[in-house]
Amino acid sequence: MESAEPAGQARAAATKLSEAVGAALQEPRRQRRLVLVIVCVALLLDNMLYMVIVPIVPDYIAHMRGGGEGPTRTPEVWEPTLPLPTPANASAYTANTSASPTAAWPAGSALRPRYPTESEDVKIGVLFASKAILQLLVNPLSGPFIDRMSYDVPLLIGLGVMFASTVLFAFAEDYATLFAARSLQGLGSAFADTSGIAMIADKYPEEPERSRALGVALAFISFGSLVAPPFGGILYEFAGKRVPFLVLAAVSLFDALLLLAVAKPFSAAARARANLPVGTPIHRLMLDPYIAVVAGALTTCNIPLAFLEPTIATWMKHTMAASEWEMGMAWLPAFVPHVLGVYLTVRLAARYPHLQWLYGALGLAVIGASSCIVPACRSFAPLVVSLCGLCFGIALVDTALLPTLAFLVDVRHVSVYGSVYAIADISYSVAYALGPIVAGHIVHSLGFEQLSLGMGLANLLYAPVLLLLRNVGLLTRSRSERDVLLDEPPQGLYDAVRLRERPVSGQDGEPRSPPGPFDACEDDYNYYYTRS
């Protein structure tokens, strides 16, 4: 009996704790914050999986070559070709073919990728670009799917696909499997990234809170791109290739379970919430001139990042005789100005929300100036300053224009955000699909200086285009046709007849029949019209 009492008390305590947690999960403000945490973790995972292979894949492909049909070299000496990631948006990496092997790597060098042969260089470039390419192809389909299914189910699908991709990475034994895993990640990102950002825009409809929430999401993207390569390199060195991917797979599974607990995407209430208004088709959104201007700015601002990353390490070695440590550390300090840019834009947007276009234009100008300054740097410190300016400008553009897309949908279309953020994801994917494949060829044919100056000039020329958005803040929120019709008084031969409210089971004790297929639609209307 004495032993039964503590067991009963433990069960009672567990029941009370479960009820308290359940009540907390259903409280609207806490639920909204938990949704933000879930989305931020999903974005963090996507970027960590994107970057964690940077120190692993070149060495892994070289290991495959050593045991396969490819040529072998003795001693095993390579140069680093994939720089450490930038703290801005998820980026693509590729090796550069112009360097030659020099000194042997010291022990414990898994944090720095080995230099592959020329044929492997092409393989790595295609491998890194495959994610963005598939994401680019899937987004025109995932956007309308998200509009139709609401946001939680596509986010759950994206997390599930990312989990499968991560596990496939862990057990990949050949290039074809690596390519399949990388492409599968692009499929998951097309659902998880787009639905996650759209969910934030939907949960935070008011502008100051929306900008702040999207800024937090961008900070998680930045942190994920920064921490993933050292995370992957350390675990790869001391625990093996599979461990970093299995850790990320476990976090992805936990995030999916948390989403199931918080959003309950398959419950009856979730199905009722999913009965959203019909969203504007994605092709019509693409033809909206304001949305087209924003999408062009997002692509333009990310081109310098996507094109400099695969090429700047070799340029540093040839221009300033940079050491391996300097090449690896070049992007690391840029994390601070990127987060600072996000914070500054959020604060300014809260105080002057009608000047979002100006913050984006200033960001493009900073990116253009920084990109033009890069070729003039002849030492490590000025180069770091210019790269910090580049990431600061990208933070200004992203933080200012992502909320602007949601606002444009609110005031000019239907407030359903899947398709518009699919357009934003397409804008990013264009830059990162081209960067790993064509950046090296441009450098070899035209030169690094011409590449940097061209990208800087493109950003400087695009900055005045954002003047077209200067009147966006003066627009008023539109109302859907359904809302207008419901608010109009009956006219002519029609009288308004109020529907009898039906009792709900559990509220008055009376049973009710099972809901029919059209009950959710009927509940949306308070009145119907009938001929008098």
From Swiss-Prot:
Potently inhibited by L-vesamicol, reserpine and tetrabenazine. GO terms for cellular component: AP-1 adaptor complex; AP-2 adaptor complex; clathrin-coated endocytic vesicle membrane; clathrin-sculpted acetylcholine transport vesicle membrane; plasma membrane; synaptic vesicle membrane; terminal bouton. CDD domains: MFS_SLC18A3_VAChT. It is a multi-pass membrane protein. It comes from Homo sapiens (Human). This is Vesicular acetylcholine transporter. Its main location: membrane. The gene is SLC18A3. Residues 55-125, 174-182, 235-242, 311-325, 378-388, 444-447 are lumenal, vesicle.
